Structure formats: structure tokens, C-alpha cells
Amino acid sequence: MNKSVVRVGDYCAEATPHFCISGSNNVFVNGKPVCRKGDNFTEGRVLTEGSKTVFANGLGIGRVEDIVSCGFKVIKGSETVFAG
């Protein structure tokens, strides 16, 4: 099932959300850098999951419902770009 792609500025579901603050320097979705597995979120968190079939710079791209190291899922992503 395809899920919305996560970009810099998108966030997780924790009560105080963590935002993606780093991403690809040359792969963009809706004009924003794509957030990939291992990219940074606020407060020292990182994206711990990513696509196993779609990559940016050799790293799995983040999608809505992937997990951040705080233990919560990403809930905000692109409204027009999706990946498996």
C-alpha cells in the first residue's frame, strides 16, 4: 500500500510533535527535501523506518506511519506524492 512521502517540516503523533529537520539535499517533494531513514527530527530524534523499495541517496524514503525514535508514527506527509 502506498503512503504519503515525508518531507522536512512533517511531524510525528507525539503530544508535542517532533518535526523532520534534515533530508535529502537533491531529492524534493512539493519543493521540500525528502526525509529518509536516519534523518533527524527535533529533540535528537531520528526516523527509524523507511521504504524498502523507494530510495533517495541510497536511503529508504520516509512515509506516513513510519516510526520516529520517540516511538510514535509520522502522521503528516505530502498530500500528492505517495510511495510503497
Regions found by a protein language model. Give the residues of each.
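Intrinsically disordered, low-complexity proline/glycine-rich segments
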Residues: 1-84
